[in-house]
From Swiss-Prot:
Keyword Aminoacyl-tRNA synthetase: no
HAMAP family reported in the protein's UniProt record: Pept_tRNA_hydro_bact
SUPFAM superfamilies associated with the record: Peptidyl-tRNA hydrolase-like (SSF53178)
Reaction equation(s) it catalyzes: an N-acyl-L-alpha-aminoacyl-tRNA + H2O = an N-acyl-L-amino acid + a tRNA + H(+)
Compartments where found: Cytoplasm
Active site: 20 (proton acceptor)
Gene from which the chain derives: pth
Pfam families for the chain: Pept_tRNA_hydro
Entry-linked InterPro entries: Pept_tRNA_hydro (IPR001328), Pept_tRNA_hydro_CS (IPR018171), Pept_tRNA_hydro_sf (IPR036416)
Main location: cytoplasm
Highest taxon, organism lineage: Bacteria
Protein name: Peptidyl-tRNA hydrolase
Species this chain originates from: Dichelobacter nodosus (strain VCS1703A)
Assembly information from the UniProt record: Monomer.
Length: 189
């Protein structure tokens, strides 16, 4: 049973519209859809809230550490609420998926994503769900850092917004219908 949804990103106005904050975007939209106002929770180093989907209480977490230190925030929440890795969904940007694509995955490595790398180290486990929001790759592989820390163009943002819409539905399906049905639905789009 899912208990915690975590959106990954970097805090601060200068990062708000960057591709690397795709996890924040989807978490914010989910909170808004459920009339949840995220509040600063210093003991979790995060913005934090609670929603109910299908009468099931779900915590929302938006770490306010930088992306590469997200594990600190996640570990604090998991200790406090006794949440196991299998009860967590991490929403993050994914270079290896084109814009407009979104995939749900259970378990696995970090795939070079430093936020996931830190979370895996902090939890001592890879056994959590990931909702991977495709942001595509830059043409020049040496420009990855600049690419993820820039805002997408309006055309690119349209594709990303479509995938965020699918992501919201996938979260609901994961909670109400289970991981297999959610994955099948999402991956058939």
């Amino acid at each position: 049973m899912l208990k915690l949804i975590v959106g990954l990103g970097n805090p601060g106005e200068q990062y708000q519209k960057t591709r690397h904050n795709a996890g924040f975007w989807l978490l914010d939209q989910t909170a808004q859809d459920y009339s949840c106002r995220l509040r600063t929770e210093k003991k979790f180093f995060a913005e934090f809230g609670e929603i109910a989907i299908n009468q099931q209480k779900i915590f929302l977490l938006k770490p306010q550490t930088f992306m590469n230190a997200s594990g600190k925030s996640l570990a604090a929440v998991c200790r406090f609420y006794h949440i196991e890795p299998q009860q967590i969904l991490i929403i993050h940007d994914e270079l290896d998926l084109p814009e407009g694509k979104i995939k749900l995955k259970k378990s696995g490595g970090h795939g070079g994503h430093n936020g996931l790398r830190d979370i895996i180290a902090a939890l001592a486990s890879q056994d959590f769900y990931r909702l991977r929001i495709g942001i595509g790759r830059p043409e020049n592989s040496t420009q990855v850092i600049d690419y993820v820390l820039k805002a997408p163009s309006a055309t690119h943002m349209e594709r990303l917004n479509e995938s965020l819409s699918y992501g919201k539905k996938a979260i609901e399906k994961l909670i109400t219908e289970g991981d297999e049905k959610a994955m099948h639905w999402l991956h058939s789009l």
